[in-house]
Amino acid sequence: MLELDFEQQLGDLYLQVNTQLPTEGITAVFGLSGAGKTSLINVIAGLIRPRKGRIVLNDHVLVDIEKGICLSPEQRRIGYVFQDARLFPHYRVKGNLQYGMSPEMKPEFDSIVSLLGIEHLLSRFPLTLSGGEKQRVAIGRALLTAPDLLLMDEPLASLDLPRKRELLPYLEKLSGEVNIPILYVSHNLDEILRLAENVLVVDNGKVRATGKLEEVWSSSALRLWLQKETLSSILNVSMVEHHNRYEMTAVALADQALWLPKMDVQPGTDLRIRIDASDVSLVLEPPRGSSIRNILAVKVVEFFDDNGHVDVKLVLSGHYLWARITPWARDELNLRSGQWLYAQIKSVSFHRQL
């Protein structure tokens, strides 16, 4: 467990954090630019000293200002991958990887290099590498220090789209194969949906929400921090079967089935899907002869009027789903909390295999 309870004034930003984070998998630190995401992980790394508070990682006290404890960055066993790779230009890739390498990681050198797909780069200098290659080397260097925690500050932010696509699969492999907790700073929703199991939402130096991605994403609080066009639902589902005639795959969503475009996965595979609120419509009775394949029984939890549209939070067997409708539709449906009706889902985006 990573226990955070600290405060610090940083210019106009007052950073005030009090939360606990799991020390497994990837936790995304999400917020708009200037929210305090990078400042938060810089305090954890020891690059910023908090004015007061405590930081404890797996029962190891990193900071306790009241007791005069504030370990230096090199004492914390924390790896850090910056937006820019910060490689040593006069060292080849192998030299960069070995710089600061922990003795206990020497037997793991080849496996880390293989995991990141950088075997063919070992003899090259950083100047000859693409942005994505540099970041893979930087990640490898951080892993080889044997950290108890890995911090990643928007590692894709400086990359163009092809380089981002090049690096993302390696980050996915990293989350599944390396048993090191990762705090991943980003304001990019697609990155978070593809990589993270948990999410911490930061706004104006404060923690607004934290927890499992599906739970936080469905919370009414997070809705206020998302751009209107990005309101969506994240659902963890399990693959059931492929259609024997059509290129479609069925997944289980609680006790109901959802049909998606065919995916090359085996029955029982856990998946994460994303459904945009604008792709969900509501009806009082299931229609007959509809072209829409996914019609689910749902209950209204709450709804919000917002600038010409209505966002409706729905629940089905513990899973939450957002729909975006017009005020006219709200009135015609006589919408109210606790009401049962049917959600029609026009399209579904597949985001990751869990």
From Swiss-Prot:
Swiss-Prot/TrEMBL catalytic activity: molybdate(out) + ATP + H2O = molybdate(in) + ADP + phosphate + H(+)
Protein topology in the membrane: Peripheral membrane protein
MF term (GO), any: ATP binding
Every ABC transporter domain range: 1-229
UniProt keyword annotations, A-Z: ATP-binding, Cell inner membrane, Cell membrane, Membrane, Molybdenum, Nucleotide-binding, Translocase, Transport
Mop domain residues: 289-354
GO cellular component terms given for this protein: plasma membrane
Main localization category: membrane
Subunit structure: The complex is composed of two ATP-binding proteins (ModC), two transmembrane proteins (ModB) and a solute-binding protein (ModA).
Protein name: Molybdenum import ATP-binding protein ModC
Organism: Photorhabdus laumondii subsp. laumondii (strain DSM 15139 / CIP 105565 / TT01) (Photorhabdus luminescens subsp. laumondii)
Upper classification of the organism: Bacteria, Pseudomonadati, Pseudomonadota, Gammaproteobacteria, Enterobacterales
